[in-house]
Amino acid sequence: MRRLAIGALATLVVLATGFRPDRDPLALEARYATPPSKFVEVDGLRVHYRDRGAGPTVLLVHGGSASLFSWEGWAALLALHHRVITLDMPGHGLTGPDPKARYAPAEMAEFLDAFASALRLGRFTIGGQSMGGDVAWHYAIQHPERVERLILVDANGLPRLEPRPMGSRIRASSVLGPVVRWVTPRFIVASALRDTYGDPSRLTEAVVDRDYELMLRDGNREATRTRFAEGEDGMDARLGEIHVPTLVLWGDRDQVILPKYGEEFRARIPRAELFLLRGLGHMSMEEDPVASVAPVLRLLDR
């Protein structure tokens, strides 16, 4: 009984101290929409994106609960010889929630196609990390006419035997999800971010602050809860339809999506090659942009 009381008290303390209201979008834009940030209207959404460099186009899609800022290291290096476009996906960053709540990978791939049309893109290389990788390979199946190459960085989307992380299960819960939508202590977010790095000492407080503040943008947490409730769609059965050169990058210390799933992507996509990034975790492109982008540069030079 005493342990139960202590547990209940601890829960109340977390709930009381962890409550965080949504952040005002305009205040966040004033802080984070600095050059070269732009906005474009796409299917009812005011989309935050960055477009830099000249040459063959590379479109990069970030992971869940992240933003275009996770690609900044890659973008700076790739833009020396390429046009590099990054964006905040619906329910993320400064773009904010989709009024129609379209967060399934296939739906976000269609949004991405509308975005590409708004920017009048032709054919391009598409890359994505985690959730963004899931969207990227869906896009390659749904719109093969536009895809020149595919880059998957610790990508999601394959059926997994391991249980989903506790945080994901809580967010998807019909009981606890609405509570967690408002209770988001910074220390829990910081802990989750550390778990995405092969070497957690590389994670800076500035990155934690940025990701945390953008996560609190009005509507983003509710969008995350909706997204986590999405089930698998079986589209992985069509991975064999992807015939463009494909680079599968995986941090060998990824504990979020294990490296064996990189092997599975390599085996199931006809022209795929796998490159393991030594010592890096789930957010390899952010943890070490120079090391992780090197195989990408070789792919683009072919």
Kindly give the residue locations of the regions a language model identified:
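Catalytic active-site module of serine/aspartate enzymes centered on a nucleophile-bearing elbow/loop
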Residues: 272-302
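Acidic catalytic loop of the alpha/beta-hydrolase fold
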Residues: 253-257
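Short beta-strand/loop motif that positions the catalytic acidic residue
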Residues: 242, 248-250
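Conserved alpha/beta-hydrolase catalytic His-Asp/Glu region
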Residues: 162-164, 182-241
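Active-site loop/oxyanion-hole signature of alpha/beta-hydrolase fold enzymes
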Residues: 36, 42-43, 50-52, 89-131, ...
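Conserved HGGG/HGGXW glycine-rich cap/lid loop of the alpha/beta-hydrolase fold
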Residues: 45, 51-94
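Alpha/beta-hydrolase fold catalytic core
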Residues: 1-56, 80-82, 121-122, 301-302
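Flexible "cap/lid" loop of the alpha/beta hydrolase fold
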Residues: 137, 141, 149-178
